[in-house]
Amino acid sequence: AGMLQAHPGGRITTAALAQQVGVSEAALYRHFPSKAKMLDGLIEYAEQTLFDRIGQIMQEQDSAEPRCHHIVLLLLTFVERNPGFARLFAGDALQGETERLRNRVCQLLDRIETQLRQILREHRAQQAALPDYQVNPTANLMLALAEGRIQQFVRSNFRQLPTNGWPEQWALIEQSVFTEPVN
């Protein structure tokens, strides 16, 4: 993941990866049958890390607003702390790689959106007095906002942090989705 951060827009070769880790290419291939499997391992690590923490958020938070907020903030903070993963999530690091890897990242992000959708669906069922919104577009908006912040982070060569301005942006979502209308 560090190499993905250090070489924005560039492809990572197995030779460069072997040199970075301090082993031979042959040693890498003894553990991973292909470069695609190496990238797949990174995606699997990200998925496991994110969904373990999402499970904790679901247990620790008892209402929809903090659950959604913490899940989206988790994604932004994860890529901010691990910029190489931002390139994976933005698709930048997967240019020229197999379609299966791109689909794997899409599946990971889709799972996050599905989690947001489920939280919002339960929230709508419990809170009839809240502003009327459609669950699917709202969950999609939350994830699209996070993906846009990740893309800006990659495009700025990791200078424009995804969490900069996040409290103000979330306040807009919170106001339109979770705040009871004033009569």
Language-model features: where?
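Hydrophobic/aromatic-rich alpha-helical bundle segments in the mid-to-C-terminal region
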Residues: 86-91, 102, 106, 124-173, ...
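Alpha-helical structural segments
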Residues: 2, 6, 19-20, 37-60, ...
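Helix-loop "lid/cap" segments that line or gate small-molecule binding pockets
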Residues: 73-80, 88-95, 172-177
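Ser/Thr-centered, proline-biased regulatory motifs
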Residues: 10-16, 36
